């Protein structure tokens, strides 16, 4: 998107309610738009708004392999509440096994380099897969 397009779009959507802005993007990019949900309160609010407009919109989250049990319960409750299925993307377990075998399970505490490695394997690679085919997220 070019700078001029952003300026034009800002003018077009200026003063609109959040639901109106979401409706615009959900319609314009149908099938190529997704909510990358952290499952935090803000994303739960966006999930409610999006499902009120188009419950077929893709909503996904990442499971790094280090989530709390309550997170899985929240995913289930959210799915039931809105009649949706949040897609869950996981890291490649071979890569996780190799990383943990070589550097330990809490390697991200040991150095910035290991933190980057861990984030790359557990977050960035699954995120790349989740974004395939998407134009807007």
Enumerate the language-model features and the residues they cover:
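ATP-dependent adenylation/nucleotidyltransferase module used to activate substrates
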Residues: 1-137
């Amino acid at each position: 998107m070019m700078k001029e397009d952003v300026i034009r779009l800002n003018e077009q959507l200026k003063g609109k309610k959040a639901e109106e802005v979401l409706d615009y993007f959900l319609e314009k990019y149908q099938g190529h738009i997704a909510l990358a949900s952290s499952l935090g309160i803000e994303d739960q609010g966006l999930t409610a708004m999006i499902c009120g407009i188009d419950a077929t919109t893709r909503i996904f989250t990442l499971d790094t392999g280090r989530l709390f049990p309550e997170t899985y319960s929240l995913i289930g409750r959210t799915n039931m509440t809105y009649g949706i299925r949040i897609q869950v993307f996981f890291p490649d377990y071979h890569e996780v096994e190799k990383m943990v075998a070589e550097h330990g399970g809490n390697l991200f505490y040991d150095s910035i380099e290991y933190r980057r490695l861990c984030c790359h394997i557990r977050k960035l690679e699954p995120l790349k897969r989740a974004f395939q085919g998407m134009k807007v997220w």
